[in-house]
């Protein structure tokens, strides 16, 4: 940004000053970028120019596209696939070792068993997301929103995984059928990336849980991230998750008979 009086400073031979703005994801390189720009301007103008970047950060909008949009999509898909693919096999392994049978004859209620399995699955999702976020931390502005997004996303993904693991008895069944709900969860995100969709799809997609999850990650990359703005998407993901756990508890109770 060229301030008033810049031309006069150049003509007087005094050190001129410019206001430089740096995108949030490059904030750690602000001083280096300013130094490079100062050298370039001094060569161009034959006079020293100081570029001030302190406090001048540019945040991406919550409807971000480009790299931020792609990162949000990747985070959503990794979260969904981790819970959706891994958890069914964890449940199947417990069926093979008869750990599940022991739990069913124990005093633990069906809801207790479901909560225990959900917590184990959520831990796996959290570990996977911690690794992914470690490589993308520079894009995150609101870590609180990211944590909430990961938690509700893990609840959704683990709910899908528990339902698949509880409903099938063999590894072949799990492998053959688990891909279908995962693809159904991934499809809205892929469609949203295409753009130019029919009006019907454009009206339906915002109600899909993976779209809401992606919106939460996008919001966390922006400077406008607040809990109030995140709440509708948080509630939407939770609303999709709740019926999954109700179904899992019902299946576990039937297995106990």
Which sequence ranges carry the predicted segments?
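Extracytoplasmic loops/domains of multi-pass membrane proteins
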Residues: 1-46
């Amino acid at each position: 940004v060229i301030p008033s009086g810049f031309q006069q400073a150049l003509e007087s031979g005094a050190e001129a000053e410019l206001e430089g703005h740096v995108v949030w994801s490059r904030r750690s390189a602000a001083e280096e970028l300013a130094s490079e720009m100062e050298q370039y301007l001094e060569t161009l103008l034959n006079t020293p120019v100081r570029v001030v970047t302190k406090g001048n950060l540019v945040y991406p909008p919550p409807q971000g596209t480009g790299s931020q949009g792609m990162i949000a999509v990747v985070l959503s898909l990794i979260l969904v696939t981790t819970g959706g693919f891994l958890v069914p096999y964890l449940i199947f392994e417990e069926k093979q070792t008869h750990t599940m049978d022991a739990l069913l004859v124990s005093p633990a209620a069906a809801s207790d068993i479901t909560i225990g399995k959900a917590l184990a699955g959520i831990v796996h999702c959290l570990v996977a997301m911690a690794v992914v976020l470690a490589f993308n931390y520079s894009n995150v502005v609101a870590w609180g929103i990211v944590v909430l997004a990961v938690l509700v996303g893990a609840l959704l993904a683990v709910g899908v995984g528990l339902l698949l693991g509880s409903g099938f008895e063999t590894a072949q069944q799990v492998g053959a059928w688990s891909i279908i709900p995962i693809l159904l969860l991934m499809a809205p995100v892929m469609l949203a990336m295409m753009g130019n969709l029919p009006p019907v799809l454009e009206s339906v997609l915002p109600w899909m849980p993976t779209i809401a999850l992606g919106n939460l990650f996008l919001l966390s990359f922006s400077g406008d991230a607040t809990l109030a703005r995140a709440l509708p998407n948080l509630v939407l993901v939770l609303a999709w998750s709740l019926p999954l756990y109700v179904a899992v508890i019902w299946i576990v109770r039937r297995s106990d008979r």
